[in-house]
């Protein structure tokens, strides 16, 4: 972060702090029995973990290495609201979802690391004494970078064998990369017998993606994967790293619709949007405002000075400033049980991303339009960086079956099939617990 932290308005820090004044931890009230559907998913996950352990033994042998085979998991995440605010030190409201990356791992007696990816059908091998970027197996760099970051944190990592699998769709904006990083961290720390506080682990995983993989991501993805709680979204302050659990309505499901479009312009356009936000801050400082980031600008303050900003920069700044306000209002609405209000905020967020930040695409717009025409949908918006990927929808549990039957049929009638890289998909999700070691009953 910049060193001119004192330049931010002190009043903004209190106005834009975590509602309720959360400290470093997330304090949760116990929830009632989650119901048979959740229990069934947990049983299915345990069966998958036992299967993965058997694949591990078939791959590496029963008694090779040292110690037991450990199975860990880390979830993907969906951002409910708060898009392109994280790198502006703003606010986000993600939820960990019940799609995850699983790793079976066992320590070795040397410094060699072997990783078998079932999704890619590939195996890589390297030594902890010489961790280098792999241009041929790019998926493995999330593993390599995470192990390197943990070693830099002082974790006494042994060599290890891993088998990795996952059902988080890649490239869809659901943070499959963060899930792989976090699962790697949990697995490595488990076999090393080394404890790392959840936030520290998330920050190490972010460091791996920033420094080793060279993707300039914010903290949201890793925080959600580590700190997620079943039945809750996480309100995250991307400046202070404070988080608060926000209860989600039990009678609603998170439904993710994959447009089938992958984000060809994402990297260049993402970098452009980020530079435009930085330009806005520089220009606002030139007008005498003491701001460190767009997080420090209120809608009223922006309205007074936005005429001085170039048109594109003005639009980007307006989105970020108003999106931060939408996140804060969303937290209040969800805490008060005002689902319809939260849904309206989701729709407003999508319109802002489409018209002001200009990161939507015809397919995302079509998916949102179709979803909002189906009964039982409280809200819908694009989620992720944009230019393709997924929408997130809040759908009443009684309407989910009809939604699944209807949404893709109507969507495919509205879009050009030649633009689709993959078959569109619908994923019905619930907010899930964050990463951890799995306990398997024999």
Indicate where each model-derived feature is located:
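C-terminal nucleotide
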Residues: 25-26, 32-77, 81, 102, ...
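A short glycine/serine-rich beta->alpha loop
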Residues: 68, 87-91, 128-136, 166-174, ...
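Glycine/serine-rich anion-binding loops at beta->alpha junctions
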Residues: 73-78, 82-89, 167-184, 376-394
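Acidic, glycine-rich active-site loops and adjacent beta-strand->loop/helix elements
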Residues: 77-78, 99, 109, 119-122, ...
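Short Gly/aromatic-enriched secondary-structure transition segments
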Residues: 89-96, 273-274
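Hydrophobic alpha-helical hairpins/lids featuring a short glycine-rich hinge
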Residues: 123-157, 161-168
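Phosphate-handling active-site elements
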Residues: 152-161, 188-204, 396-410, 414-418
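Fold-level recognition of mixed alpha/beta catalytic cores in primary-metabolism enzymes, strongest
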Residues: 173-256
């Amino acid at each position: 972060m910049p060193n001119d932290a004192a330049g931010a308005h002190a009043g903004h820090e209190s106005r834009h702090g975590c509602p309720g004044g959360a400290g470093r931890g997330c304090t949760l009230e116990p929830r009632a029995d989650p119901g048979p559907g959740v229990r069934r998913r947990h049983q299915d996950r345990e069966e998958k973990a036992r299967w993965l352990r058997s694949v591990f033994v078939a791959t590496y042998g029963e008694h090779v290495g040292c110690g037991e085979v450990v199975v860990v998991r880390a979830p993907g995440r969906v951002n409910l609201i708060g898009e392109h605010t994280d790198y502006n030190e703003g606010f986000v409201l993600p939820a960990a979802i019940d799609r995850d990356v699983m790793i079976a791992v066992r320590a070795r007696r040397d410094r060699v690391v072997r990783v078998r990816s079932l999704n890619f059908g590939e195996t890589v091998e390297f030594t902890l004494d010489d961790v280098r970027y792999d241009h041929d197996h790019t998926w493995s760099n999330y593993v390599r970078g995470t192990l390197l970051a943990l070693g830099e944190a002082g974790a006494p990592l042994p060599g290890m064998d891993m088998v990795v699998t996952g059902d988080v769709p890649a490239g869809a904006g659901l943070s499959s990369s963060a899930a792989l990083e976090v699962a790697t961290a949990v697995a490595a720390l488990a076999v090393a017998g080394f404890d790392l506080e959840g936030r520290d682990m998330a920050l190490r995983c972010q460091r791996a993606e920033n420094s080793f993989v060279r993707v300039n991501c914010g903290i949201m993805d890793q925080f959600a994967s580590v700190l997620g709680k079943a039945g809750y979204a996480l309100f995250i302050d991307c400046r202070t790293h404070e988080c608060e659990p926000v209860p989600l309505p039990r009678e609603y499901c998170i439904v993710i619709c994959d447009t089938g479009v992958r984000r060809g312009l994402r990297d260049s356009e993402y970098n452009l949007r980020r530079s435009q936000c930085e330009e806005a801050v520089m220009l606002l400082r030139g007008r005498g405002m003491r701001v460190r980031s767009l997080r420090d600008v209120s809608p009223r303050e922006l309205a007074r000075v936005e005429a001085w900003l170039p048109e594109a920069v003005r639009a980007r700044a307006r989105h970020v400033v108003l999106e931060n306000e939408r996140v804060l209002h969303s937290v209040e609405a969800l805490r008060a049980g005002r689902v319809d209000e939260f849904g309206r905020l989701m729709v407003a967020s999508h319109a802002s991303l489409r018209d002001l930040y200009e990161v939507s695409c015809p397919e995302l717009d079509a998916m949102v339009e179709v979803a909002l025409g189906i009964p039982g949908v409280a809200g819908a918006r694009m989620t992720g960086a944009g230019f393709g990927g997924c929408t997130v929808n809040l759908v009443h549990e009684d309407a989910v079956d009809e939604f699944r039957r209807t949404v893709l049929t109507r969507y495919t009638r509205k879009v050009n099939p030649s633009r689709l890289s993959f078959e569109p998909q619908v994923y019905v999700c619930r907010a899930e617990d964050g990463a951890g070691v799995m306990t398997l009953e024999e």
